[in-house]
């Protein structure tokens, strides 16, 4: 009888300690995830602010001030408000960037410095997103994250002031690692 009581107390103690450890691991994981998410969000806000500066500069310096330019700037602003549709935002930025490069709008060193800053912020944003996504995918972090409604973030692929590939076409391409892979076993 004493052995059974000892065994029951031992199991209850193990369960209580296990629940306490689980609680602290979950709390720590969610705090770290929240920090990384806030870092991604703050970089997105910094990126958005710099794009607003770019838009003001483009519209003030542009001699043509064409309807197309205003249209592309407005589409870009609308896309930034809804970060969920990142591919659409990138497509609008691609179109605006292409329009500016094709029209050869020479806006001087200010534009070059803004483009350089935008590219630096994009690089920072992508590294922050990578850090967040890697932390998100580690076991058991993704379980806690899904329970709290966190989702993976998407990377930006646009480079400002340079010729880019259409992001929609780029998203349809087969990745380099999958080009020579036999996938016939998947269709069986």
Each language-model region and where it sits:
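A helix-centric hydrophobic-segment signal that preferentially recognizes long
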Residues: 2-188
């Amino acid at each position: 009888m004493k052995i059974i009581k000892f065994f029951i107390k031992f199991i209850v103690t193990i369960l209580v300690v296990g629940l306490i450890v689980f609680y602290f691991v979950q709390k720590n994981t969610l705090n770290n995830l929240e920090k990384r998410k806030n870092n991604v969000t703050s970089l997105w806000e910094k990126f958005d602010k710099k794009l607003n500066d770019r838009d003001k500069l483009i519209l003030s310096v542009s001699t043509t001030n064409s309807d197309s330019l205003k249209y592309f700037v407005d589409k870009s602003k609308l896309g930034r408000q809804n970060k969920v549709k990142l591919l659409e935002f990138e497509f609008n930025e691609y179109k605006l960037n292409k329009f500016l490069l094709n029209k050869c709008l020479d806006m001087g060193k200010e534009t070059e410095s803004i483009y350089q800053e935008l590219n630096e912020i994009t690089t920072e944003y992508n590294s922050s997103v990578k850090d967040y996504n890697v932390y998100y995918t580690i076991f058991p972090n993704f379980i806690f994250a899904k329970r709290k409604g966190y989702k993976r973030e998407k990377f930006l692929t646009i480079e400002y002031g340079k010729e880019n590939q259409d992001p929609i076409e780029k998203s349809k391409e087969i990745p380099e690692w999958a080009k020579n892979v036999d996938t016939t076993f998947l269709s069986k």
